């Protein structure tokens, strides 16, 4: 039993995935055919023994609520375990006021009721694997007030432009948090993952609300960096931040490569998801599939190359799919020519 409860946050108002986000939150996006993006943070928590998890959602919660259900498929449905969907009403027409702090403050009584002394906060829009037991123990052993998880990259001028970065000293103490503005290639990308005591978390929420109704959690942590002992811990392995359409596409396509996928998937660290009873994919005569991820329940008659195909798709004869992500239950076929 972990000494921490978990919080999975919704994406910030600055994150826009055009073409998808107007229909569902990023956590409910299809990922690699069979998963949803939110499966990764919840699986990390479940595998780490965290069985009391709050999932925050701001808009269009239906698809996320249907996928999460009671949480049984995440292996957290014990007598004490509970997966809670926390609704945060958008209280202002101006999104700048609809922050994560506003969501936490609106549900602060539920946070205060938690019996665990620590909280681990992770985003619903980043994909990675991490043992939070080790992260929590590192936090406790260090004596830090707050521990932040980061991933070092060497392509920050072109990628991760909607993310925060950590400025660290030689002892990996966090000196400040700021936006990645593409001014340098090597950066420590903040993975929006925090470890701290429940009491400090509540204190920061209330402090932020007093300073400004526009404050976010990264901003109040940055504001407090001079007074608190804040440490950074480096993450190893696969990491993707879904903050726009290109990053969503690239995250899916990159995992077609087996070596890349090995940095995320491990038989000893399962990624749980809602299962669907469906037959194996059928490959009919004339089908051609190369370097692709094909989910269950599909019917393939055409050509698929370097693509991710969701569950229950039909690729009809003559159709050619290349370098694409096809969402579940899609039908791809060649249109009949229009006769005048």
Name the predicted role of every residue range:
Residues 1-252:
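Unchanged
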Residues 1-10, 209-335, 339:
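Left-handed beta-helix
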């Amino acid at each position: 039993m972990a000494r921490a409860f978990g919080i999975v946050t919704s994406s910030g108002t600055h994150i826009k995935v055009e073409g998808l986000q107007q229909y569902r939150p990023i956590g409910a996006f299809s990922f690699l055919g069979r998963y949803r993006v939110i499966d990764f943070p919840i699986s990390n928590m479940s595998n780490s023994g965290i069985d009391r998890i709050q999932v925050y959602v701001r808009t269009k919660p239906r698809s996320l609520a249907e996928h999460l259900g009671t949480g049984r498929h995440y292996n957290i449905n014990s007598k004490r375990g509970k997966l809670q969907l926390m609704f945060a009403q958008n209280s202002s027409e101006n999104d700048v006021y609809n922050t994560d702090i506003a969501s936490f403050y609106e549900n602060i009584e539920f946070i205060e009721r938690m019996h665990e002394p620590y909280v681990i906060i992770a985003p619903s829009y980043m994909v990675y694997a991490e043992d939070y037991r080790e992260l929590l123990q590192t936090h406790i052993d260090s004596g830090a007030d707050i521990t932040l998880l980061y991933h070092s990259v060497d392509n920050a001028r072109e990628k991760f432009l909607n993310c925060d970065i950590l400025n660290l000293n030689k002892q990996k103490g966090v000196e400040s948090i700021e936006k990645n503005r593409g001014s340098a290639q090597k950066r420590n990308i903040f993975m929006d993952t925090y470890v701290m005591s429940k009491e400090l978390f509540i204190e920061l929420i209330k402090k932020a609300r007093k300073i400004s109704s526009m404050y976010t959690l990264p901003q109040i942590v940055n504001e407090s960096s001079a007074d608190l002992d804040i440490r950074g811990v480096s993450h190893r392995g696969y990491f993707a931040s879904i903050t726009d359409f290109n990053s969503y596409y690239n995250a899916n396509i990159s995992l077609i490569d087996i070596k890349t996928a090995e940095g995320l998937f491990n038989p000893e660290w399962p990624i749980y998801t809602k299962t669907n009873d469906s037959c194996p994919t059928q490959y009919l005569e004339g089908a051609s599939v190369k370097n692709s991820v094909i989910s269950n329940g599909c019917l393939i008659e055409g050509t698929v190359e370097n693509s991710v195909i969701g569950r229950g798709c039909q690729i009809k004869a003559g159709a050619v799919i290349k370098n694409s992500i096809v969402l579940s239950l899609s039908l791809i076929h060649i249109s009949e020519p229009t006769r005048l």
